[in-house]
């Protein structure tokens, strides 16, 4: 199975996908290019599957990918992206067997004409 290089070295590509995956878990929708979104989809699908398992090994595996970002909820409680993945997001998809994300085309980006899309959690 191949992957997209996205014009970056492997460590830069891994860092970019970690940032995008964390942003998608936190805000539940991200606007990016089509190639990045298609690569991000596979990363996030695997993370949500780990979240559904819920055991300690899965939590540690997901912690290697997600950034340690804190989220302030409406009720003034602080939650990390990892806690949101294993709590709120995993509960939402207990009955769903994959296909956790949706990619919507927005059109070409103004600066360089790259195809822009919105990737969001279903």
Swiss-Prot record:
GO terms for cellular component: cytosolic large ribosomal subunit. It comes from the Bacteria. Gene3D superfamilies: Ribosomal protein L17. Pfam families: Ribosomal_L17. GO terms for biological process: translation. GO terms for molecular function: structural constituent of ribosome. Keywords: Ribonucleoprotein, Ribosomal protein. InterPro entries: Ribosomal_bL17, Ribosomal_bL17_sf. Part of the 50S ribosomal subunit. Contacts protein L32. Belongs to the bacterial ribosomal protein bL17 family. PANTHER family: LARGE RIBOSOMAL SUBUNIT PROTEIN BL17M, RIBOSOMAL PROTEIN L17. This is Large ribosomal subunit protein bL17. The lineage of its organism: Bacteria, Bacillati, Bacillota, Bacilli, Bacillales. The gene is rplQ.
């Amino acid at each position: 199975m191949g992957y997209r290089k996205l014009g970056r070295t492997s460590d830069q590509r891994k860092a970019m996908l970690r940032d995008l995956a964390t942003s998608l878990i936190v805000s539940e929708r991200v606007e990016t290019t089509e190639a990045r979104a298609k690569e991000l989809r596979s990363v996030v699908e695997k993370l949500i599957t780990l979240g559904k398992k819920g055991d300690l090994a899965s939590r540690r595996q997901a912690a290697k990918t997600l950034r340690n970002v804190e989220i302030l909820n409406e009720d003034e409680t602080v939650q990390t992206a990892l806690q949101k993945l294993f709590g709120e997001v995993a509960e939402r998809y207990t009955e769903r067997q994959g296909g956790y994300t949706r990619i919507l085309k927005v059109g070409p980006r103004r600066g360089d004409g790259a195809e822009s899309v919105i990737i969001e959690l279903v």
